[in-house]
Each structure stands twice: as C-alpha cells, then as structure tokens.
C-alpha cells in the first residue's frame, strides 16, 4: 500500500473542510512463489485493517492480479480533503503496520517507482461514468 515519511502525532481535523472524491490507482509486483499466500491473506483481511481503511476515507477498494506477469493493481476512491494526512493516519496504526509486515514479503516493488513509494502511483488517463 502507502509509505509516508515521518510520523504525525495528531490527525488534522477535516471539520468544516470540503471533501471530494478522487479515483486512485497503484501497482506493484507479486513474488511468483507468494501468489497463493497473498490470495489467502486477502481472502480474510483483518477487520481492524478494513475499519481503518474506511476511517481514512477509502471506498470501493479493489486489488486485481495479472498473471503470469504477477502484477497487482489497486484501485480505490478517496473521499476526503487531505489524503496525505489520512494516509499517515493509516500508516500510524499498529494493526495496519502488522498487516503490512505480513503482506510486504509477498510484494516486489517496481524498479520505476518514485523514491519513498512501495506501491507505485499511477496516472488516471481515462474515465467514463
């Protein structure tokens, strides 16, 4: 998922701030020998992790797998006004950190990712409702 440099002690209030929806996509490689384990893990995501995802304004979240290349594509819709703060809030959660520690060995970050990224951000080039 997202790597945020540094730590934040408190979550900035979004009270009174206008919220918006933004479609987001990211991709990463999946180690060939970990495909089964990754699928097993995501068939039973921990409830605390799912709750934190919702709390941070992420909706309609899906992860797709492309085989035989073993590429993961994640899509979600962010409903909020400060994605960086919400991502940091998620990253500060001990249960989410434990989940990532289990999932990370399955993943192979793309060589072309930006510095500090685990999952590589993608540009939306087309959308049709």
Residue ranges: model-predicted function:
Residues 24-29:
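Active-site-flanking beta-strand signature of metal-NTP-handling nucleotidyl enzymes
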Residues 116-129:
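Charged phosphate-binding loop/patch that engages nucleotide di/tri-phosphates or the phosphate backbone
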Residues 34-59:
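Short amphipathic alpha-helical segments
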Residues 50-73, 77-79, 83:
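Short, glycine- and small/hydrophobic-rich beta-strand elements in well-ordered beta-sheets
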Residues 10-20:
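Short, Lys/Arg-enriched N-terminal segments with co-localized hydrophobic residues
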Residues 21-23, 69:
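A general secondary-structure signal for short beta-strands and their flanking turns/coil
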Residues 56, 78-118:
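An amphipathic, aromatic/His-enriched active-site/gating alpha helix that lines ligand/cofactor pockets
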Residues 3-5, 18:
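Acidic, Ala/Val/Gly-enriched low-complexity intrinsically disordered segments
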